[in-house]
Amino acid sequence: MPRSCYSRSGTLLLALLLQISMEVRGWCLESSQCQDLTTERHLLECLRACKPDLSAETPVFPGGADEQTPTESPRKYVTGHFRWGRFGRGNSSGASQKREEEAAAADPGFHGDGVEPGLREDKRSYSMEHFRWGKPVGKKRRPVKVYANGAEEESAEAFPLEFKRELTGERPAAAPGPDGLGFGLVAEAEAEAAAAEKKDAAEKKDDGSYRMEHFRWGTPRKGKRYGGFMTSEKSQTPLVTLFKNAIVKNAHKKGQ
């Protein structure tokens, strides 16, 4: 009883598949596997023989021939003259580029041109080494401080700030020169001479008013230039006095 039910269901399934296969390919029934359908083994062999033929074909849609979906070859023929229908590195589609980018992101060592990442980095650094931004950014070098005294350089880190100030205030000891005198004595003599000059200048300032001879207003007055012989005494008379004298002379002449 179970075998008869199985055979009936298998027969119905085979009939359905055969009907579809007849529409797709009529020679499926003419094969040797589908000649004898009485046994279960022959039925399964016929199903296996017709199944690859059905899967290889495109699905059949109802309607006329003009309503069927176009095949791949006419589609390629229609879009072949467009830029996105061509194959190539420069004219590849956006989907292929996206797939390449995803593959590159998944595999860090993969590049589309097949070049190893180490070689690419070397080439990039070589081609951009003449640019300022192509050089690696390193730590800025600080200028080296040069001290006049060797003790200050040695004690720059060992002594605190107060000791540094004391060291900067002190001067190195006088070293004996080739003539037997120390540089310290020469410095003391120069300091004494400068102090004497300052003292003399202060005394001169106390004696009289300080004249700024190097300025224009430090020169003697106009009346004192050239010993005073260029100016006449009449010019010193006021103008009002001259007018009075002239009026008196005119009145005296008229009275005569």
UniProtKB/Swiss-Prot annotation:
Keywords: Acetylation, Amidation, Cleavage on pair of basic residues, Disulfide bond, Endorphin, Glycoprotein, Hormone, Phosphoprotein, Secreted, Signal. Residues 88-120 are annotated as: Disordered. It comes from the Eukaryota. ACTH and MSH are produced by the pituitary gland. Glycans are attached at T71, N91. GO terms for molecular function: G protein-coupled receptor binding; hormone activity. The modification Valine amide is found at V137. The modification Phosphoserine is found at S155. One of its GO terms (cellular component) is secretory granule. It is found in: Secreted. Residues 1-26 form the signal peptide. The modification N-acetylserine is found at S125. The modification Phenylalanine amide is found at F87. Disulfide bonds join C28-C50. Residues 100-122 form a propeptide. Pfam families: ACTH_domain, NPP, Op_neuropeptide. Belongs to the POMC family. ACTH stimulates the adrenal glands to release cortisol. MSH (melanocyte-stimulating hormone) increases the pigmentation of skin by increasing melanin production in melanocytes. This is Pro-opiomelanocortin. The gene is POMC.
